[in-house]
Regions:
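ADP-ribose/adenylate-binding Rossmann-like module
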Residues: 102-103, 107-108, 118-143
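Segments forming oxygen-rich coordination pockets for charged ligands
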Residues: 1-84, 98-101, 180-185
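Adenosine-phosphate binding glycine-rich loop
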Residues: 131-187
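Short amphipathic alpha-helix with an adjacent loop that forms part of the alpha/beta core around
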Residues: 88-99
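Short, charged, surface-exposed secondary-structure boundary motifs
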Residues: 72-76, 94-95, 138-141
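Residue-level detector of alpha-helix initiation sites
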Residues: 44-45, 110-111, 135
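Short amphipathic alpha-helical segments
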Residues: 51-53, 75-76, 115-118, 141-143
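Short phosphate-binding/catalytic loops that engage adenosine nucleotides
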Residues: 59, 125, 149
Length: 187
């Protein structure tokens, strides 16, 4: 039962109990949680840094990008074949997202985000966030409203991602975003 739950990426527990005729009976329960997943959609230096830092932190990393050079750069740290995005408007199921997953959009050109965010918001992903300013985030949410995404789903979207605002270098932004994700998974 526990093994099947882990294969299905569900939290499971195992209990061990001593014989009932012994005093005192010894029992111990262990809870096992699937490894966290970090699913990244983006391009550029922040995308690359986030993949590397996510993997170094122990996350299973998945990547989607319109840039083949970015996918090639992060391929060594991925846990699955990267997905080459062909069009900003193409919808795709994000089947790899579950309750133990975080999904981030890491684009400076935000045209790629709406279809991806709509798909992500239809999943049980624990954390969904996007790069950008507060103004960009408000525009992003308005775009999702125009796409008829329910307000309850839109409220799940985090942005701008990161615990430290207004960072400029890719590695610092990645660390700041990952810290926010870690904090969410610890709650």
């Amino acid at each position: 039962k526990a093994e099947a739950a882990l294969r299905a990426r569900r939290t499971s527990s195992l209990a061990f109990e001593g014989p009932a005729d012994e005093a005192p009976a010894i029992s111990k329960e262990f809870e096992y949680t699937p490894r966290h997943r970090l699913v990244l959609a983006g391009r550029g230096a922040i995308f690359r840094s986030m993949a590397q830092i996510g993997r170094a932190t122990g996350y299973d990393v998945f990547a989607l990008s319109p840039e083949l050079s970015d996918l090639d750069a992060v391929r060594p740290v991925l846990n699955a074949e990267p997905v080459h995005l062909m069009s900003p408007n193409s919808s795709m199921p994000l089947d790899m997202l579950d309750a133990h997953s975080a999904f981030l959009t890491l684009f400076h050109d935000h045209d790629w985000e709406p279809a991806l965010l709509r798909a992500a918001l239809d999943t049980p992903a624990r954390f969904i966030g996007s790069l950008g300013s507060r103004r960009t985030h408000e525009m992003r949410k308005e775009t999702l409203r125009q796409m008829k995404v329910p307000e309850a789903s839109i409220s799940r979207l985090r942005g701008p991602i990161g615990l430290v605002p207004s960072l400029r270098d890719a590695s610092s932004i990645a660390v700041s975003a990952l810290a926010e994700i870690i904090a969410e998974f610890r709650n």
